[in-house]
């Protein structure tokens, strides 16, 4: 339940806020973590994104990693590996089944964040240098 509430709040931050507000207010590290977690859940359940969505996902992932490496005030490798070792593993351990509401939400969220419009929003966000850990992760 907590995951669903958090995911809903974060989805709003990533998908529904105006582009200018998202650029200023959303943590790049948060966006990166959510994309990685949702993608890992789909991988775990053997669900592939369409080629165009996977290509957008990979471009956004690479762009966010580059941004984190260029702008992080803390060790960027530790930030990225922490997402892998903590957030992704915890999400997969908490995934009840590939039929659960949480998993269905992951599919929906990743569909929303792999649209061309969302990729453009992310590109705009990454054009504004700042600490990638500063910003909201769900309002």
Spans of features found by a protein language model:
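Immediate post-signal-peptide N-terminus of mature secreted/exported proteins
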Residues: 23-55
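Bacterial N-terminal signal peptides that target proteins for export
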Residues: 1-9
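Compact alpha-helical subdomains of small soluble proteins
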Residues: 60-139
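C-terminal segment of classical bacterial N-terminal signal peptides
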Residues: 14-21
């Amino acid at each position: 339940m907590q995951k669903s509430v958090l995911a809903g709040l974060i989805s709003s931050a990533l998908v529904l806020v105006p582009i200018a507000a998202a650029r200023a207010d959303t943590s790049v590290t948060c966006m990166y973590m959510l994309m990685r977690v949702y993608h890992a859940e789909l991988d775990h359940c053997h669900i592939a994104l369409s080629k165009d969505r996977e290509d957008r996902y990979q471009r956004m992932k690479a762009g966010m990693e580059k941004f984190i490496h260029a702008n992080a005030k803390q060790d960027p490798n530790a930030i990225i590996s922490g997402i892998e070792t903590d957030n992704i593993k915890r999400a997969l351990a908490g995934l009840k089944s590939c039929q659960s509401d949480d998993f269905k939400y992951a599919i929906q969220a990743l569909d929303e964040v792999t649209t061309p419009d969302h990729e453009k929003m992310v590109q705009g966000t990454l054009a504004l240098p700042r600490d990638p850990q500063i910003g909201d992760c769900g309002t």
